[in-house]
Design a protein with these regions (language model features):
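Catalytic and substrate-binding clefts that recognize carbohydrates or anionic sugar/phosphate headgroups
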Residues: 1-194, 200-207, 214-219, 402
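Aromatic- and carboxylate-enriched substrate-binding clefts and catalytic-loop regions
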Residues: 79, 86, 223-411
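Composition- and surface-driven signal marking solvent-exposed, interaction-prone regions
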Residues: 140-143, 150-153, 211-214, 229, ...
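N-terminal small/glycine-rich loop or linker at the start of catalytic domains
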Residues: 186-200, 303-316
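Short, acidic/polar
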Residues: 206-219, 324-334
Length: 411
């Protein structure tokens, strides 16, 4: 993604009126923005109740101390302490490298269409930070944002819409603070014991090769808890290498009788893991089924939006459409994955929702839904597992995340 903005006008708003009501304290900012400030159990919330037409960006400055340290903004892979830098918040591939001045990143940008990474590129951004002054701040938005911690006297938080609310909560210790933060955002389900009981082998190539590696590992005294075959759905050969067949059911040529082989693994105390993502290749069986049901996001002209994933095209399952959400949950994850005994999978590609000419069922701009997509994708997986009675047994793991992912993603 290449994101640019043309700023027409940026106006500072000052407080012109304040009124205490039964609901809280109402703040009027020059008649352009109205906030309701409330406090409950030590948490302060500033909720936006009114905004003037035309306001489509939002900046907030929060007082800072020169010796303050700041952490968070989701999964930031280059820096633990965010102080002294700004962090654009947009779910994406991390890219190749973390520094635009290095040769490998420059070459990747030039030769691969801007695939080089920067220090802030992450699958899992989040408009939340934790301060060494023992408070956290969360902004209720899934729009593109940029949290800037470079000024010694204030933090400047930006988002490309007006957030629903801003929440601030403090605690005497970091342990207590994180307890409060996870109570608000949600807590990851506890992992099952089997993930700790040995090696989870990643193998590809079909039954003979993949299950053969398990046999050889056991023969050499290696404790094995799982076998992960991401090509359980088949392979697709492109000009630049082997890819997966994005049609999420077991491939009867590469993995014949896979359910029976999974049963045999289970008898040996070993789990089987696969791979699923929320896109379906347009020459696959599931795409044809989904097209009849109208589960795919559209273009402005009403046709299915197809994403070019490199010599093959895929439909975007529209999780804002309740029927599409239910279909993928029940007919793809449950029927073709859980029901054949699969114990886990990589739930990939939550960070890829396109933003150009994409029309979603709920009518919300994809620029707003893009950062929300990882949480919707996690929720789809979570509900499939929970409704199957396998929560606490099955593990699906994700790279992409955002606000709301925490309680829906097992790993």
């Amino acid at each position: 993604f290449k994101i640019e903005d043309h700023l027409i006008e940026r106006r500072p708003l000052t407080l012109t009126a304040a009124r205490v009501t039964e609901q809280g304290t109402e703040l009027d900012l020059e008649g352009q923005l109205k906030l309701l400030v409330t406090e409950k159990d030590g948490a302060v919330t500033l909720a936006v109740t009114e905004k003037a037409e035309g306001i489509n960006r939002f900046w907030l400055r929060v007082e800072a101390a020169e010796d303050e340290h700041v952490y968070g903004c989701g999964e930031q892979m280059s820096y633990f302490d965010l102080r002294g830098r700004h962090f654009p918040l947009w779910s994406s591939e991390p890219g190749v490298g973390r520094d635009k001045t290095t040769y490998v990143t420059w070459r990747s940008d030039v030769e691969n269409g801007g695939a080089g990474g920067d220090y802030y590129n992450t699958n899992y951004p989040e408009p939340t930070y934790v301060s060494s002054r023992h408070y956290y701040l969360h902004m209720d938005t899934t729009a593109y944002g940029d949290f800037d911690f470079r000024n010694p006297h204030y933090h400047e938080l930006q988002c490309w819409n007006v957030p629903g609310f801003i929440r601030i909560e403090a605690a005497p210790t970091f342990v207590e603070l994180l307890e409060k933060l996870t109570a608000f955002l949600g807590r990851q389900p506890e992992l099952p014991d089997w993930v700790y009981n040995g090696l989870i082998i990643g193998a590809q190539g079909g039954n003979e090769r993949s299950f053969g590696i398990v046999d050889k590992s056991l023969e050499h005294g290696i404790k094995v808890s799982g076998l992960w075959c991401q090509d359980w759905c088949g392979k697709r050969v492109t000009s630049f290498g082997k890819r997966l067949q994005w049609d999420w059911h077991y491939h009867k040529e590469m993995y014949p009788d896979l359910p029976k082989h999974i049963e045999e693994l289970h008898a040996r105390g070993i789990k089987f893991l696969g791979y699923v993502n929320p896109y379906l290749v347009n020459d696959g069986e599931l795409y044809a089924e989904g097209k009849k049901l109208g589960v795919f996001a559209k273009k402005a002209d009403g046709s299915d939006y197809l994403v070019d994933f490199g010599e093959f095209y895929c439909g975007v399952v529209d999780f804002t459409n309740p029927e599409a959400f239910r279909w993928f949950k029940d007919e793809v994850i449950k029927k073709y994955t859980l029901d054949i005994g699969i114990d886990g999978w990589m739930a990939d590609f939550g960070e890829y929702l396109p933003t150009d000419d994409l029309v979603l069922a709920n009518g919300v701009s994809p620029m707003i839904e893009h950062n929300h997509w990882p949480a919707l994708w996690a929720k789809c997986n979570y509900e499939a597992v929970k409704e199957s009675g396998k929560l606490g047994q099955v593990v699906y793991f994700m790279r992409a995340g955002g606000t709301g992912s925490q309680k829906y993603c097992t790993l």
